[in-house]
Curated annotation (Swiss-Prot):
Region of interest called Disordered, as start-end residue ranges on this chain: 74-97
UniProt keyword annotations, A-Z: Ribonucleoprotein, Ribosomal protein, RNA-binding, rRNA-binding
GO MF annotations, alphabetized: rRNA binding; structural constituent of ribosome
GO cellular component: a single term: small ribosomal subunit
Bias-annotated ranges (Basic and acidic residues): 82-97
Gene Ontology terms describing biological process: ribosomal small subunit assembly; translation
Pfam families per UniProt: Ribosomal_S19
Protein name: Small ribosomal subunit protein uS19
InterPro entries: Ribosomal_uS19, Ribosomal_uS19_bac-type, Ribosomal_uS19_CS, Ribosomal_uS19_SF
Family: Belongs to the universal ribosomal protein uS19 family.
HAMAP family: Ribosomal_uS19
Length: 97
């Protein structure tokens, strides 16, 4: 269930403050944030935001198609190690039995 429309989108106050200051100055620096729950607003388009994934900050360039999504959607938190090799698994079973 999503957030009520009458409440408006959630954006961390310090993040929106930094975005607005940079828009006034016309700067395009990378902004580090831990706020994965913040929603992407139209005024963020064109900025690069480094979103924390639990281990490091992943740079995310904001485009128009991302408006309305959350920052955390673009910074995966889980690492996929790959599926096990069938030959290696078969060899382990033969050695045990």
């Amino acid at each position: 269930m999503g957030r009520s429309l009458k409440k408006g989108p959630y954006v961390h106050p310090s993040l929106i403050k930094k975005i607005r200051e940079m828009n006034e100055k016309g700067e395009k620096k990378v902004i580090k944030t831990w706020s994965r729950a913040s929603m992407i607003l139209p005024e963020m388009v064109g900025h690069t935001i480094a979103v924390h994934n639990g281990m490091k900050h992943i740079p995310v360039y904001i485009t128009e198609q991302m408006i309305g999504h959350r920052l955390g959607e673009f910074s995966p938190t889980r690492r996929f190690g790959g599926h096990p090799d069938k030959k290696a698994v078969k060899g382990k079973i033969e050695k045990q039995g």
